[in-house]
Amino acid sequence: MFTSKSNSVSPSPSLEQADADALDISTKVQLYGVLWKRPFGRSSAKWSRRFFIIKESFLLYYSESERKSFETNKYFNIHPKGVIPLGGCLVEAREEPSMPYAMKISHQDFHGNVLLAAESEFEQTQWLEMLQESGKVTWKNAQLGEAMIKSLEAQGLQLAKEKQEYLDKLMEETEELCLQREQREELERLNQVLEAEKQQFEEVVQELRVEQEQIKRELELTARCLKGVEQEKKELRHLTESLQHTLEELSIEKKKTLEMLEEDKNQPQPLTNQSEQPPASDGLHSNLRQIEERMQELLAEKLLAEKRMKENEERSRALEEEREFYSSQSQALQNSLQELTAEKQQAERELKAEVKVRMDLERRLREAEAALRSLEQGLNSKVRNKEKEERMRADVSHLKRFFEECIRNAELEAKMPVIMKNSVYIHKAATRRIKSCRFHRRRSSTSWNDMKPSQSFMTSQLEANNIEELKEVAKRLSRDQRFRESIYHIMATQPGASALPRGGK
């Protein structure tokens, strides 16, 4: 019943490429072939063969003989037997008693249905697909498509504009973030410098404390030396008094001896005693010489003691000056420690304030980034509602406030590193001042090293031996009874000795 070949139903793209290029654009069709058609408008079971062409959104049909002319001339007849508009039509497959591969075309404006039939299932599927695709092309769809294209173009322009604005803001934000990052790196570097200065400051404070302890020990040593010098002064004073008393006694004894010699010289002696007198006179003269020698020794010892007392006085004054010097240095170190402690506390307060400000800026920056991301999501979203628009306006207001605050704080942000540098320079100047003070103190203290009475007095073995020897000589002279006994014995052997008092005892 249907003797068409397999190529009787073929789309125009299946033609050779050269032939397709030679055709006019108006002759290009989507699909052509021979189908069975039942009459329109009246009920009839008769099916007839027709040559059908799908051109754009229209179905044209001719007599079967037109197929040969179309394939030969490569263009279709503009006077078909009928034209069926496919726009908005519903195309579906169905089965008829004699045609298992039938197709129904219906539309609300048609006064009936159009029934077509193919020879095979493959051909039915091919025609159904093309008829359904052609039915989508309508005037309304064309107008809607144009309106949608214009709307999409307008939205694209708006989105491109908003995207450009967003990119500009993103670039500004990126520059701001880079600036914030650079300032944070600068702050971290300054923090490292401050940590190093803080450690150096603590080392300087520790050195000052050690020096203060050393000065304290030197003050204690000076005080002990002063106490020892005072004790020696007392002992030397006592020794001098003892020597003076001994000299006075020897002077009295010398005077008495001289009186005895004078009396013995003036007293007439018997002739029988003249032979005995020269020895007695010689003994008195010998004793007198011994007394004078002893007095010379005592005078020398007294002069030595007075010299030692004078040296002790000078050493006492030097120790007193040394103690005053160490006291002033200790007070200066204490003042330096107090100043350094105050500067350290001030620097720590400034650093804490800077860290607090930096944390607040970072928090506001994170909030601005969140608002920027929310604004980006709102701009990229295709669905707009009142809630999203309110949220976008709130994000824009938040970003505006953030940038205004950035502008207001720009000058302060620029000055913050300078403030931190100044704090570092203050610590460096304080360190230099302390080192200079310590250098001058050491320089001035070196002049005292050669004349420290405490060290020389306590460590000189020769001077210590001289003091001990002086003490022993003084004690020996003040307690020398043999000399006195010899004097009293000589005086007792002389005439009139019983009348002399025992002053030595």
UniProtKB/Swiss-Prot annotation:
Residues 264-284 are annotated as: Disordered. The keyword Repressor does not apply. It comes from the Eukaryota. Keywords: Coiled coil, Methylation. The modification Omega-N-methylarginine is found at R502. Pfam families: PH. InterPro entries: PH-like_dom_sf, PH_domain. SMART domains: PH (SM00233). Residues 28-136 form the PH domain. Residues 146-391 form a coiled coil. Residues 267-278 have a biased composition (Polar residues). The keyword Zinc does not apply. Belongs to the PLEKHD1 family. PANTHER family: PLECKSTRIN HOMOLOGY DOMAIN-CONTAINING FAMILY D MEMBER 1, SWAP-70 RECOMBINASE. This is Pleckstrin homology domain-containing family D member 1. The lineage of its organism: Eukaryota, Metazoa, Chordata, Craniata, Vertebrata.
